[in-house]
Regions:
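Sec-dependent N-terminal signal peptides of Gram-positive bacterial secreted proteins and lipoproteins
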Residues: 6-29
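Short, solvent-exposed loop/beta-turn-alpha elements that line the ligand-binding surface or hinge
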Residues: 136-150, 179, 188-189, 232-262, ...
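Hinge/lid segment of periplasmic solute-binding proteins
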Residues: 40-58, 122-178, 197, 322-324
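Periplasmic solute-binding protein
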Residues: 130-132, 148-188, 197-201, 215-246, ...
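Glycine-centered hinge/linker elements that transmit conformational signals in sensory
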Residues: 197-201, 242-281
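Extracytoplasmic "Venus flytrap"/periplasmic binding protein-like
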Residues: 83-147, 153, 175-185, 290-291, ...
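Extracytoplasmic/periplasmic substrate-recognition and gating elements
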Residues: 82, 86-87, 91, 96, ...
C-alpha cells in the first residue's frame, strides 16, 4: 500500500499546522510589520490530568535517542518527550540534525560509527533506502491500523511511522473574500480553472487589485509545487513514480505531457494576479503571510505548514482559512480539481541493528503513546 497523495479538499475551517516555522523578520515593503514588541507569547497548556495509556513499567529507566530532521518541531518534541518521561520513566533525547545537513548522511554516519539513534525522523526516500538493512519491523504495531493510506510498505512490511501529514494547494481567507464581494463564500462553488479566474476577476473589480500571494522561495515554487505534474498523473505515489520512470525512459515526452501544460497554465494565472508581480524576487515569504492575514490578498499558493506564519501575521484560530485545489483545467470530474495533495512529509524509523530489546520496546511504546494516549 503506497501513501495516499491526493486527499479530499477541506472546504472550510482552519489551515491546521503540523509544524512550527520561524519568522525571518525581513521586510520588502508589501505590507506593514506585524511584530508587536509588547505582545505576549501564549501557549495552550497540555492537559495531563487524564491518561489511560498503559505503560510498561519494566521499561522505566531506559534511555533512547530520537534523531530529528524537522527543525520546526524540535522544541515541541523536547516538551513532549519530557511529558512522556514523567509518565513512563523512559528518557528520550531529541537530537537535532544540524541546519543544512542531510538527514540521510547524518544517520548513515552514525551507523558507521556504531552509535545510531534508537529512532530517526527521516524523509520517506531515506527510509526506503535504509529500512530493510537497518530498521526494526513495525508491521504488527497497533497504530498501523490507524494510518491506512499513509503507510509506506517495503516488500510487504512496514518499517516507519508516518509523521507530519502536510497538504498544499491554494489557501484562502474566507473573510476577505466575503467582505470584498458582499456575500457568503462557498469554496465548493469553485470547481475549475475558469471558475477560479472568474472569482479572481470579481475580487479585482471589488478593489483587491492583486488577490494572490506568491512567495519567491525556490523550495515552494519549484521543489514543492512542480511535483503536481507527477502526483496528478493518477493520484497515488505509485502513479507518480510510474510517470517519472516513463519520462526518464523517453516513453512520455515531458514537453507534450498534459499535466505540465496544465500546471503552467495555472501558474501563469497566479503570476498574473500576484501581489508582488512588479517585484517577484522581492516577495518575502513572511510578507506574503502578512498580506493574506491583513486582507491585501485573498489567496496564497502554499501548504498547511504556513499556518504559524499566518498566525504570527495576525490571524486567529477562530478565523476561517482553508484550501482550494490547484485547479489544472476546466474538467469538473478531474480529481485534481476536487482534492488537495497531502502526504506524510516525514517518517520515523526505528533501529533494528544496534538498539537493545528494551530500547526498541521503549521506542515502540513512545510511538504508540503519541497515537493512543490522551496526552500524546
Amino acid at each position: 500500500m503506497g501513501k495516499r497523495i491526493m486527499k479530499k479538499v477541506i472546504s472550510s475551517g482552519l489551515v491546521l499546522a503540523l509544524a512550527v516555522t520561524m519568522l525571518t523578520g525581513c521586510r520588502f515593503g508589501f505590507a506593514s510589520d506585524p511584530d508587536d514588541p509588547n505582545e505576549e507569547t501564549k501557549e495552550v497548556p497540555i492537559d495531563t490530568s487524564v491518561d489511560t495509556f498503559e505503560y510498561d513499567t519494566s521499561l522505566s529507566g531506559t534511555s533512547i535517542t530520537l534523531l530529528n530532521s524537522k527543525a520546526e518541531i524540535q522544541v515541541a518534541l523536547e516538551k513532549m518527550s519530557a511529558e512522556y518521561e514523567k509518565k513512563s520513566g523512559v528518557h528520550v533525547e531529541v537530537m537535532p540534525v544540524t541546519d543544512g545537513d542531510s538527514p540521510y548522511t547524518k544517520v548513515v554516519s552514525l551507523y558507521n560509527s556504531g552509535t545510531p539513534p534508537t529512532a530517526s525522523i527521516l524523509d520517506t526516500t531515506d527510509v526506503i533506502a535504509l529500512a530493510e538493512e537497518k530498521a526494526a519491523d513495525l508491521t504488527e504495531e497497533p497504530w498501523v491500523a490507524e494510518a491506512e493510506g499513509y503507510l509506506t510498505e517495503i516488500n510487504g512490511k512496514i518499517y516507519s511511522f508516518p509523521l507530519c501529514i502536510e497538504g498544499r494547494g491554494i489557501i484562502y481567507n474566507k473573510a476577505v473574500i466575503e467582505k470584498a464581494l458582499g456575500e457568503s463564500f462557498d469554496p465548493a462553488s469553485v470547481t475549475t480553472q475558469s471558475e477560479f479566474v472568474e472569482l479572481l476577476d470579481r475580487l479585482v473589480d471589488a478593489g483587491i487589485k492583486k488577490p494572490v500571494s506568491m512567495a519567491k522561495e525556490d523550495w515552494s515554487l519549484g521543489a514543492h509545487q512542480l511535483q503536481y505534474i507527477y502526483e496528478t498523473y493518477e493520484g497515488t505515489s505509485e502513479g507518480a513514480q510510474e510517470i517519472i520512470e516513463d519520462i526518464k525512459a523517453g516513453k512520455v515526452d515531458l514537453s507534450s505531457y498534459d499535466r505540465l501544460s496544465q500546471f503552467l497554465d495555472t501558474f501563469d494565472i497566479l503570476k498574473k494576479y500576484n501581489v508582488a508581480k512588479g517585484d517577484p524576487l522581492g516577495a518575502d515569504y513572511d510578507e506574503m503571510a502578512i498580506d493574506l492575514a491583513d486582507g491585501k490578498t485573498a489567496f496564497w499558493f502554499n501548504g498547511n505548514w504556513a499556518w504559524p506564519n499566518i498566525s504570527e501575521a495576525g490571524a486567529s484560530e477562530e478565523d476561517a482559512y482553508g484550501f482550494l485545489p490547484y485547479f489544472l483545467n476546466d474538467d469538473k470530474s478531474d480529481f485534481a480539481n476536487q482534492k488537495i495533495q497531502a502526504s506524510p512529509s516525514k517518517q520515523i524509523m526505528l533501529d533494528g541493528q544496534i538498539a537493545t530489546e528494551k530500547e526498541q520496546a521503549a521506542a515502540k511504546e513512545f510511538l504508540s503513546w503519541i497515537v493512543f494516549s490522551e496526552i500524546g
